[in-house]
Amino acid sequence: MRRIYPHRHLLGIEGLSRPEIVALLDAAESLFDVSRRSVRKVPTLRGKTVVNLFYEPSTRTRTSFELAGKRLSADVINISVSTSSAVKGESLLDTVQNLQAMQPDVLVIRHAASGAPHHVAAHTRAAVVNAGDGTHEHPTQALLDAFTIRRAKGRLEGLEVAICGDIVHSRVARSNAHLLTTMGARVRFAGPRTLLPIAGESLGATVYDRIEPALEGADVVMMLRVQRERLSGSFLPSTREYSRTFGLNPARLALAKPDAIVMHPGPMNRGVEIDPRVADGAQSVILDQVEAGVAVRMAVLWILAAEANEFSATGEPRPAP
C-alpha cells in the first residue's frame, strides 16, 4: 500500500505537492473529533516516544504538540532548554546526538536559527518536525491555518487571502504563502515597507505597502504581530502609529467580503495589529485555529511515527488491500 505522505520528516511546506498537503489535512480531519470525546485518547502511537525540543518560547505550539502526542498514546518528553545542558554550552548537534542515543521516534524542534531542523534531520534516525525555525518556516502552523480555512470556507482554491503585518520576519507568512498558492489560493502581503520582504512576489504573493487595498474583497484576513524580538533597527514608528495605519479595526474589516474570516497565529497584541472588537467578533476564527492545531499535529505525528500503511489514524488496523 502506498504511503499517504512519502517523506521521512516535515521540515517545511515549500516543495510539498498538492496531494501531499491534502493528505495531511485529511488525516487531521479524521482525528479532529478525538479531542471532543469524553475519553480524548486513541492507541495509535502506543510504544512510540516523542521529544519536544524548544529553543524559543512557545505556548500554543508546544502545548498542542504535547497534547497531540499524549492523545495518540505516545510517551512525550518535553525538554526545557533553559534547564538543559544547552545553558552550559552544549551544541545543538551534541544535544541531538545524545537524544538519538535514547532512541526517540520523533523529534519536534523549534529554534531561532533558520535551517536548524534540517541540520538536526541530517544527524538523527528519528523523524523530525519543524516547529518553527527562525524566519524560515512554520509548517504545522500553515497546515492548521489551511485546515481552519477549509473548514470555514469549504475550499482553499480560488480564495483571496490577505496576510498583514510584519511579513519580513514571519515564518508563518512564508509557510502560508507556499501552502496557499500550491492549493490555488491567491495571497496578498501588506505591511510597512520596512517590514515587507524584498522579493515577496517570489513567494507568489501580491505585495502592498498599505493595508486597505490588500483587504478589499478578501475572503480571509490573517493578522501578524510585529516581532520586536527580531527587529535590529528602525523598522517602524511608534506602536500607536503602527496601529493607526495597519491595525485591523471594524472599519477596515468592512473592506473585506461580508463573510470574510479573521485569523491570527498568536500571540496577539490587542489594540496594536488587531482591535479587540475584531479579535473577539463574529468573523474571528482565532480560537478555531488553536483547536485545529491539536488535530493537525496529531496527524503529523501519526504519519511520521506510526506504520501509516497498516493502521488508520485512530489506531484501528487497516483492512488488507
Swiss-Prot record:
Enzyme Commission number(s): 2.1.3.2
InterPro entries found in the cross-reference section: Asp/Orn_carbamoyltranf_P-bd (IPR006132), Asp/Orn_carbamoylTrfase (IPR006130), Asp/Orn_carbamoylTrfase_sf (IPR036901), Asp_carbamoyltransf (IPR002082), Asp_carbamoyltransf_Asp/Orn-bd (IPR006131)
GO cellular component, one term: cytosol
Leading EC class: transferase
Reaction(s) the record says it catalyses: carbamoyl phosphate + L-aspartate = N-carbamoyl-L-aspartate + phosphate + H(+)
Entry keywords, A to Z: Pyrimidine biosynthesis, Transferase
Binding site for L-aspartate: 88, 171, 225
Cysteine pairs bridged by disulfides in the record: none
Self-association and partners: Heterododecamer (2C3:3R2) of six catalytic PyrB chains organized as two trimers (C3), and six regulatory PyrI chains organized as three dimers (R2).
Name used for this protein in its record: Aspartate carbamoyltransferase catalytic subunit
Native organism: Sorangium cellulosum (strain So ce56)
